[in-house]
Regions:
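Short, solvent-exposed loop/turn elements at beta->coil junctions and helix N-caps
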Residues: 1-2, 81-82, 123-127
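Conserved glycine-rich beta-strand-loop-beta hairpin in the small C-terminal domain of fold type I
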Residues: 47, 63-72, 84-97
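A short beta-turn/loop motif at secondary-structure boundaries
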Residues: 5, 85-88, 127-131
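Short amphipathic alpha-helical segments
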Residues: 10-11, 60, 89-91, 133-135
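Conserved core segment of the aminotransferase class I/II
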Residues: 1-65, 155-157
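Residue-level recognition of strand-loop junctions within catalytic nucleotide-signaling folds
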Residues: 18, 51, 96-98, 140-142
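PLP-dependent enzyme catalytic core of the Aspartate aminotransferase-like
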Residues: 103, 111-120, 126-160
Length: 160
């Protein structure tokens, strides 16, 4: 529930298996890796999330969907040199930035960071060839922050 309920610091991860071998291996890992164990705060947080978090999760998903829709529309309507792919199952928008005309991925990353003043995920993380010319934009943030980032990208792209 770490991402769904924004409780990453509570160590609330859980795993389930019917496979005896996987169970044995996971238990062995927990014995040697202190970071894998939960504490009382994590246990309470986990139970609270699963027992009382439905409304929060529903509201969060609705908010993120609206933010995603606004962000994708803004990019595709206002930044003609960038195309946004509407994600179906993640909070990252895949940006096709090849229309900006940069020759290297480094130039694209520098443009986003130095000119647009935004820090995006590098598309080449998903393959040097396949991700070249692409960036990922995280929209799992307050909507005004997301829109400010997109405005900065637009203004920087308009200056090219």
């Amino acid at each position: 529930p770490a991402k769904t309920f924004n409780v990453a610091g509570f160590r609330t991860a859980a795993w389930f298996t019917h496979n005896e071998e996987i169970y044995r291996r996971m238990m062995n890992q927990q014995t040697y890796k202190k970071g894998m164990g939960r504490n009382i705060f994590g246990n309470v947080a986990l139970m609270a999330c699963y027992n009382h978090g439905d409304d929060y999760a529903d509201q969060c998903v609705a908010y993120l969907n609206e933010t995603k829709n606004q962000a994708v529309a803004y990019i595709n309507e206002n930044i003609p040199k960038i195309h946004a792919v509407n994600p179906e199952a993640t909070f990252m928008i895949w940006l096709d930035c090849r229309g900006l005309g940069f020759k290297t991925q480094k130039e694209l990353k520098d443009f986003m960071f130095k000119d647009a003043k935004v820090l995006l995920n590098d598309g080449t993380t998903f393959g040097e060839k396949e991700g070249n010319g692409f960036m990922r934009f995280n929209f799992a943030a307050p909507r005004p922050v997301v829109m400010e980032g997109l405005k900065r990208i637009k203004e920087a792209a308009d200056r090219l």
